[in-house]
Amino acid sequence: MANLVDPTNVRTSGNGWYSKYNIYLFYTYSGTPNYVHFKTNVSANTEKIFMIEAIGYNYGGASAIRAAWGVYTTGGGGTTPKGLQTIAGLTADGVYTSSDGYACIRAYAGSLYFAGWILNAHVHPNYSVNISITAASQNSTSGNYY
């Protein structure tokens, strides 16, 4: 269902990268379920500002995919959306904190039949972090999955 890919790092900043391309590759041949959840390695107990974007294709939705999740982890255990943007093919449906305290993003599409996308991460230089995706699941959960 999903494969990890080697990321391409762009411009280091202290303990992380400003941008990381191809942090995760997701693809599916199944049209349903319609939600996909991604769990990051970013703890909600640290104050971080970052954006994750999805770029790809959605054959079942007859559209290119372009979506983005702006995320702020509060440092107090919370994860707050700071701009969810959907251009086409996949809805940036939400952000949340996992049960074990990590930032997660949720995507939705009316159909995921032959859909695939890469995730890229962009971090504010003052809040650098080496972002990775630690888990992904295609399911029917519209709320918090992790």
Question: What feature does the model see in each segment?
Answer:
Residues 1-146:
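Trimeric viral appendage architectures of receptor-binding fibers, tailspike depolymerases
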